[in-house]
Each structure stands twice: as C-alpha cells, then as structure tokens.
Amino acid sequence: MSPSEYAREVSKRRTFAIISHPDAGKTTITEKVLLFGQAIQTAGTVKGRGSNQHAKSDWMEMEKQRGISITTSVMQFPYRECLVNLLDTPGHEDFSEDTYRTLTAVDCCLMVIDTAKGVEDRTRKLMEVTRLRDTPILTFMNKLDRDIRDPMEVLDEVESELKIACAPITWPIGCGKLFKGVYHLYKDETYLYQTGKGHTIQEVRIVKGLDNPDLDIAVGEDLAAQLREELELVQGASHEFELEAFLAGELTPVFFGTALGNFGVDHMLDGLIAWAPTPMSRKTDTREVTAAEEKFTGFVFKIQANMDPKHRDRVAFMRVVSGKYEKSMKLRQVRTGKDVVISDALTFMAGDRSHIEEAYPGDIIGLHNHGTIQIGDTFTQGEDMKFTGIPNFAPELFRRIRLRDPLKQKQLLKGLVQLSEEGAVQVFRPLTNNDLIVGAVGVLQFEVVVARLKTEYNVEAIYESVNVSTARWVECSDAKKLEEFTRKNELHLALDGGNNLAYVAPTMVNLNLTRERYPEVTFHQTREH
C-alpha cells in the first residue's frame, strides 16, 4: 500500500465516545447516529424493556433486562466520506472504570445534555476525565420536543460548571409542543422540524436567510420575532467557534435537537466530521507514537468476557495507534515479550461480530483472549515500549463475596480473577485469611459481579459488608523496610488480582496515620495497567 493511500485511510477515521448523565438520551443518540450512518435500519426504541427489540448497543443479559448500558460497546459506521468509530460508554449512575478507560481510547467526545435538566452529576465526573487529556468535546442539547429550560441559561451553566466555553452552532426555535426547528448560525439557514420516529428520517425543509418572509410563515410571526431577538443576544454574549480552541478542549460547539424525533443529530455529525481530529498520537514510556508511522502499534483498553454466550470466550478491545493491521500478522505482546500471530481479529457492529482483514489508526479491533491479554497491554511489531495513561483507580466501595456452596471456592476465585482482569471489578485477597474482597467504583458493579458469577461460572455467591473504606497500592524502594512494613501491618494488607500489594484501610484516619508512620512507603491511589 502506498504512503498516500495509507494517509488517506487514516484521515477518514474519527473515533469518539458519548458522555452523558443517565437518561439524558445517550442510548437513543447512539441509535440515531447509527441510523444516520445507515448502519441499522430500525432504530430499536430503547426503553421498551419488555419488548424483544433491544437497543443495538445494549447486549449483555443484565443490560437487556434493565434497559441500561453497563458495558462499553464499539460500533463502526460510514458517514459521508468518513469512517466513524463510536464507543458507547455506560451512562448509568453506577458505572465502572471501564468508562474512564474507554475515554483513553478516543480522540473526541460528544456530550449529551438533557436541556430540561442542564448539567448533571455524572456529566461533571466524566468531563473531569476528559480534562486529563484535553479531549475535544462537541455538545448536543437533547429533548427539545419536551419543555426545556431557557437555552441561554443552560449554556451559562455548562460554561460555569464544566469550565468550557460554548459556541452555539444551531439555535432552537420554540420547544415542547411548539418546537419548530433550529437555525444554523454559520450557514444562515433554518431547518424546520418534522418528527421522524423509529427509522424514518424526514426530508428536512430549509428556509434560507434569517430575514426571509417564508420563515415567518413557516414558524409563525411570534416565534420568528423571538428567534431574531434571541440571536442578537446569542451573537453578542456567546463565543464564536474557533477550531484551535475546540481541539485544545477549551471550547465546545453546541447543537440543539431531539434524538427521539431524529432531528439535529445529522447537524452534529456534520460538525464531528468537519472538526473532530483525525487519529491522534499517543505517549509511551519511551517516546510519542504518531498515526502516520507505518509500523503497527496498539493498546488494550478493555476486556470483555462472553460477548457470545455460545462461546466461553473473552475479547480484548485494542485501539490501533499506528500502522495497518493485516490478517495473520505477527505482533509482539510487550508485557510478556512473546510474539503472537493475530489471525482472527474482530470488528464490531455492537453484538454482531465479523472478522476483519485490515484496520487502521483510530479503529478498534477485538482480539480473542484466553486469559493471556490484560488491560493496558501494548502490541508492537517488535519495539519494546508501553503506552501510558491507562489507569486503575482505587475503588471507593468494598464488599466481601461469600459462597452459598463452599466447595466452589476454586471456581469463585477463577471467576473473580477473570472479572478483575476484564476491569469489571477489583479483587483483593487479604494476607491473613481466605476472604475475597471486591472493590468497585459504583454499587451496581457488585450486582453485576454476582449475576455474572452465576450465569458464566455457575457460582452462587452473595456479597456482604466488610470493614474496608479505602485501598491504596503500596510501594517501597527499600526491600527491608517493605518487609518490616508488611510484617507489622499484615492485618490490613492484601494482594489484588495481579498480585500487587495493597493496603486496605478500615478508615481514612487509619490510612493517614499509617502514611505518617511509614514515610518511606508510597501509597498510590491509581496504578498504571
């Protein structure tokens, strides 16, 4: 393949994730984005929890029952001249580090806001994570077909609470029953709203020019006058769109619409294609790798068990950073130092898996994994280096896992270690007893673990409270001092799923006292994979 063909393939790629608070309409947006990309013909209406049509991106058993996305799915679809990779992240209040790690694999994010509610808690948390890497953000103000708050007020809230400048690209005309469409500030065009339900995309009527008398006829004189008045305010008070500020994560272009009504999503997608960065470079422990390099590199950011109930398999999701993946390619797994032949990588249309012949930077491919691949693994064509910035967070909640049938201890341990390698939960085995303690970022994770132990490992387990309030990974360069520390504190020490030593503290006070007592020991809140 010639360098110019390779460069063309790379420049076609856009890789993004959607971040939002639960119920802001993220799963609906995912559906509609795929619909506009023609990837699915019937956008499964998402909340029909009892019906058989489940949203294309929610496919694990528990998700199907609850109608929430728990695991991250990956979908690739064509849009205009580009190939878009969409990573769906759990939006439910209780989600895991999976979400955080997924954000390390994208080049851009779409923030979805319920315009009736404004900025909500989960959105704040996710924005903090995107901040760590200055990820560019586009914003979609959703649910304009309902009664909403004053759009100007919501923009102010985004700016003050999320510390990011807003540049409106479209502006709404009315809302709820009176929602008439949006005006595009940069094209001087009004797009009139006709509801499109399910998989019908209506032909949009366009009125050119803000002063066009046809606009008054189409939306009514009152709303047309209100629009002109609001736009004067908006243009005076808000930011102009600047590509550089957007790419630096300092400014977000804002689009208005209703995902459920299939309206406005395409304007946002057009913005994504025009402005979102092509595959970005990534740092390793030795140098920075750019997408233009011909040698293949990639990193694993997520592992998912049993994507196919018919196969007891696990799939490792790898983000391609540079080079072209080709079938039966030989790659070095840097952590183990072993060369492996990858003959059956997968591409994703959530839940449907098809084998692929090639992949380029920005693409996400799935590797079959029988326990040999871990989150954070780097694959190269021989170069020894490791991509950095894929974190393990110290859990915030802890439970003891207990068996109903004590004879299944072996299966329980196997299941928990596999789930911890997958990043679904973290496991701690105390040095002084046979307890198994699991740590998570949110309560729902414990339910997920118990449910999956039952369906995937045939182990009946229950979780109960345990006297642990926080955990820190410990490290000390002086082996003698570490040994002394271990001997004196073994009641509060445990090994995690990767056999790393961790201090499990009953209280924050205890942790702080121990820290003061052993200044030569480092207590880490995150650990690189």
From Swiss-Prot:
Subcellular location(s) of the protein: Cytoplasm
Top-level taxon: Bacteria
Pfam families in alphabetical order: EF-G_D2, GTP_EFTU, RF3_C
Main location per the UniProt record: cytoplasm
MF annotations from Gene Ontology: GTP binding; GTPase activity; guanosine tetraphosphate binding; translation release factor activity, codon nonspecific; translation release factor activity, codon specific
InterPro entries on file: EF-G-like_DII, EFG_III/V, G_TR_CS, P-loop_NTPase, PrfC, RF3_C, RF3_dom_3_sf, RF3_GTP-bd
Family matches, as CDD domains: RF3 (cd04169), RF3_II (cd03689), RF3_III (cd16259)
Keyword entries, A-Z: Cytoplasm, GTP-binding, Nucleotide-binding, Protein biosynthesis
Gene Ontology BP annotations: regulation of translational termination
Domain tr-type G, chain residue ranges per copy: 11-280
Sites where the protein binds GTP: 20-27, 88-92, 142-145
GO cellular component: cytosol
Family per record: Belongs to the TRAFAC class translation factor GTPase superfamily. Classic translation factor GTPase family. PrfC subfamily.
Its biological purpose: Increases the formation of ribosomal termination complexes and stimulates activities of RF-1 and RF-2. It binds guanine nucleotides and has strong preference for UGA stop codons. It may interact directly with the ribosome. The stimulation of RF-1 and RF-2 is significantly reduced by GTP and GDP, but not by GMP.
Annotated protein name in UniProt: Peptide chain release factor 3
Organism whose genome encodes this protein: Pectobacterium atrosepticum (strain SCRI 1043 / ATCC BAA-672)
